[in-house]
């Protein structure tokens, strides 16, 4: 692994459109160096025979049987509308003619 320089950090910051104060460049240089060293360690791990995964915990969809439930709340909903016209909600016009 090549050494990360202050110029490398400035370049990455510029690409990310970050304005880093000059007094923080040394800190970020060391942090980026450690991050990339860790990535090198991960690259060296033998993963032969390990199945690929996309998440740590299996996701299970909780499903239920659909069922029809008779409801008659139409009038209740219409009564709550701030403005209505017959059996329709009246809303402000948003598109020009």
UniProtKB/Swiss-Prot annotation:
GO terms for biological process: glutaminyl-tRNAGln biosynthesis via transamidation; regulation of translational fidelity; translation. InterPro entries: Asp/Glu-ADT_sf_sub_c, GatC. The keyword Chaperone does not apply. Its EC number is 6.3.5.-. It catalyses: L-glutamyl-tRNA(Gln) + L-glutamine + ATP + H2O = L-glutaminyl-tRNA(Gln) + L-glutamate + ADP + phosphate + H(+); L-aspartyl-tRNA(Asn) + L-glutamine + ATP + H2O = L-asparaginyl-tRNA(Asn) + L-glutamate + ADP + phosphate + 2 H(+). It is an enzyme of class 6 (ligase). The keyword Transmembrane does not apply. GO terms for molecular function: asparaginyl-tRNA synthase (glutamine-hydrolyzing) activity; ATP binding; glutaminyl-tRNA synthase (glutamine-hydrolyzing) activity. Keywords: ATP-binding, Ligase, Nucleotide-binding, Protein biosynthesis. Allows the formation of correctly charged Asn-tRNA(Asn) or Gln-tRNA(Gln) through the transamidation of misacylated Asp-tRNA(Asn) or Glu-tRNA(Gln) in organisms which lack either or both of asparaginyl-tRNA or glutaminyl-tRNA synthetases. The reaction takes place in the presence of glutamine and ATP through an activated phospho-Asp-tRNA(Asn) or phospho-Glu-tRNA(Gln). Heterotrimer of A, B and C subunits. Belongs to the GatC family. NCBIfam families: gatC. This is Aspartyl/glutamyl-tRNA(Asn/Gln) amidotransferase subunit C.
